[in-house]
Amino acid sequence: MAPSVDSIATSVANSLSNGLHAAAAANGGDVHKKTAGAGSLLPTTETTQLDIVERILADAGATDQIKLDGYTLTLGDVVGAARRGRSVKVADSPHIREKIDASVEFLRTQLDNSVYGVTTGFGGSADTRTEDAISLQKALLEHQLCGVLPTSMDGFALGRGLENSLPLEVVRGAMTIRVNSLTRGHSAVRIVVLEALTNFLNHGITPIVPLRGTISASGDLSPLSYIAASITGHPDSKVHVDGKIMSAQEAIALKGLQPVVLGPKEGLGLVNGTAVSASMATLALTDAHVLSLLAQALTALTVEAMVGHAGSFHPFLHDVTRPHPTQIEVARNIRTLLEGSKYAVHHETEVKVKDDEGILRQDRYPLRCSPQWLGPLVSDMIHAHAVLSLEAGQSTTDNPLIDLENKMTHHGGAFMASSVGNTMEKTRLAVALMGKVSFTQLTEMLNAGMNRALPSCLAAEDPSLSYHCKGLDIAAAAYTSELGHLANPVSTHVQPAEMGNQAINSLALISARRTAEANDVLSLLLATHLYCVLQAVDLRAMEFEHTKAFEPMVTELLKQHFGALATAEVEDKVRKSIYKRLQQNNSYDLEQRWHDTFSVATGAVVEALAGQEVSLASLNAWKVACAEKAIALTRSVRDSFWAAPSSSSPALKYLSPRTRVLYSFVREEVGVKARRGDVYLGKQEVTIGTNVSRIYEAIKSGCIAPVLVKMMA
């Protein structure tokens, strides 16, 4: 059973300070003196992705109420409200309430003037005029409530209803962001309307909102209209509450609330913003941050499984010669994860050319170049985090906007969600490229010709009857191909809309949805990678345990059969021949592999003892004895490994102290063990797919995030 996200995240929260509110306090307690670009509230060039994930976990897992003031909402707060049900309220600040009331009063004085969306029509119909400002808001909602949802409760009861609706967490996040934006007092939306939204959130009432139908140009008009209609008690609005779907009217009555009547501009103020796109983007980016940390952890584990070189992550290569900040960050993370590993090569000894023949001098690109590959992706995600922090926490997205200081109404394009859409394009590409490096690391590890003597397909028994990870190899290719397709831009598909008025638009919600979909596919791929790499480090542990007994055995048999002729130099040549052959015949079954290995090694003995009197009989006797003893030894080591309790797995003593944390999490808490094989055991166990599914669920639920933070902190 995976640990509770809340229990782990709370411990992280207790160790971190709330930087936003501390910054506000440092400004005399008045956050409203800050500008929208208040740098102290946002990621800086010194901020690492690990810092960001720690902060998100802390804010999301906090137990205090989120106070919305238009300036200090963090992305972690949005995650907390959306996924953890953190309660929210409009901050108890006289300044906020005064500003909101003043904007409402200023608008009242402008009702005789031509104000867009208050006395005029909407969009391309802004050439119409009306004096009935209240009815105009109803007309706005009427034409925007045009999405496709089930026509009866039976559709929801049969599980068909939510396939065309936004995830409930996205709607909750959108409501939180919209209230936060409206507290800034630029939209003339009354406190009572904002409190209607927070009451819905705090009573667990979530509007059912269509998945599609917005181009995120003049905000997310249609999705936000469904939210606005719900708080007015629209008779055809559906909501989710207490695990049930019911009408908004029923939910309002059930929870003892009151519907609101929208005043002038309040319908427009509710729907003319980017909150839905920003909410989906925030959740997608949060997941992408965690997947990035997991990709780095998997790189470290793959280095261990492949007996790779820690030197690829040396500070000289990154901090000194090519000091891109996020490349340095990724290299440092992987280097830190490898500290203390008995698998990874930490100190390379210079060797002569003749002693190095046939040996791969350095790791292949997927491991060696991973900081250079992942670093720029991390940079894009950190930038996306800064953009979304501004969008969700410190921005007014509406039109027109009220400028109280200058007593003006500004008509502009503050609703355009291109900033959100652009971050999602870059994030989704980063997600696809993370998948690419994971796929290449994984397939190298599964390939018997590339994986430094690991068994073919990571089979724990004879490869002729165990193809363990072969299906996963194919599945990983499918996931990677799909990621490549999803990486294509959405923004290039903009179409002119709404009488040509919205001739350019952002498609931000579509892009955010595609990014969330890409995250899901990457989660499948990384779950597959994690399953395989843990099997690989277990098999490598068996190899290391075998080597401890195997090398003395080779020494003993050389001396037993060749006496004083078996010098250290002869032994060294024979040993090199053996290990070279073991990297070439790892797709053979056990008995065939050892007989083949010592047939080849016999040639090394002949070469090493050239000029000495050695009979063919003694050579053959040595070859047969070595093969038989090696076969028996391998079987003994295997049986000991599988008989041992999982908590005493040999891999634990070879892994680094930090990668050991992730290994133990999967093996013990998620409950996915190393696999020996159905054919060998003579019975069918839990399928490979079920075990990968368990890891996938640990990723998707968020349980793995605190584990990754613990590893890297």
Curated annotation (Swiss-Prot):
SUPFAM superfamilies: L-aspartase-like
A GO biological-process term: cinnamic acid biosynthetic process
Key words, A-Z: Cytoplasm, Lyase, Phenylalanine catabolism, Phenylpropanoid metabolism
Quaternary structure (record): Homotetramer.
Entry-annotated residues carrying 2,3-didehydroalanine (Ser): S218
Protein residues bound to (E)-cinnamate: N272, Q362, R368, N399, K470, E498, N501
Family under the similarity heading: Belongs to the PAL/histidase family.
The species this protein was found in: Rhodotorula mucilaginosa
Name by which UniProt lists this protein: Phenylalanine ammonia-lyase
CDD domains per UniProt: PAL-HAL
Position(s), cross-link 5-imidazolinone (Ala-Gly): A217-G219
